[in-house]
């Protein structure tokens, strides 16, 4: 092959090779900046732990009860084990009656490997971002939610091997939700004390005089 032609082909393919995706199996939703950040976290996770985390971000309109585990099996042959796949399908139907949509799946290569992360913690890290009412567009919320959930997943996997990752994100939303829960709990106790317990104690004291 002519060297000039070969050089042209290599130059044309270089951007594709540079952006070759390891952690993202399917992407219908994520912006390039988010995809690159996920790739960075995924590569650091593999380098430090040998664990693999993958993302499927799809705009497919799955029907109610669609089996996400079966859906991911078509990727299984090319995946490195042990692995976890984070599936984000915002247009998947949840119930037929309400027509509500949006499903998340976190699918490990084995039940044993599932012990290396907190399913609910990873799920909530993404959903908490998406459900917050703010000025962000739904597209931006989807991107931030997937990024935050993947970061939480990577941190969970790394922590299970006593490793700390440098490329992951602080879960500010998770911390905010935790603080809000504490405030709500404290407020409930305060209301209970002011309107029920304190008057009851005062009546008992006055009755004993």
Predicted segments with their positions:
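Bacterial N-terminal signal peptides
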Residues: 8-16
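Absolute protein N-terminus
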Residues: 1, 20-21
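Intrinsic disorder/low-complexity segments enriched in polar/small residues
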Residues: 4, 125-129, 206
């Amino acid at each position: 092959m002519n060297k000039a032609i070969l050089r042209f082909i290599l130059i044309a393919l270089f951007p594709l090779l540079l952006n070759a995706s390891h952690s993202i199996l399917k992407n219908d939703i994520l912006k390039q900046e988010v995809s690159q950040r996920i790739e960075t976290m995924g590569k650091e996770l593999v380098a430090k732990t040998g664990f693999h985390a993958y993302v499927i971000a799809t705009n497919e309109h799955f029907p109610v009860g669609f089996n996400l585990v079966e859906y991911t099996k078509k990727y299984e042959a090319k995946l490195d084990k042990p692995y976890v796949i984070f599936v984000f399908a915002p247009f998947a139907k949840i119930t037929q009656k309400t027509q509500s949509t949006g499903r998340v799946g976190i699918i490990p290569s084995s039940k044993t490997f599932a012990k290396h992360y907190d399913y609910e913690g990873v799920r909530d890290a993404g959903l908490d971002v998406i459900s917050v009412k703010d000025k962000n567009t739904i597209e931006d919320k989807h991107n931030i939610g997937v990024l935050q959930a993947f970061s939480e997943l990577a941190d969970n996997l790394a922590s299970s091997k006593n490793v700390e990752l440098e490329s992951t994100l602080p879960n500010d939303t998770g911390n905010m939700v935790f603080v809000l829960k504490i405030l709500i709990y404290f407020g409930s106790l305060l209301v209970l004390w002011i309107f029920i317990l304190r008057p009851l104690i005062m009546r008992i004291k006055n009755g004993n005089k």
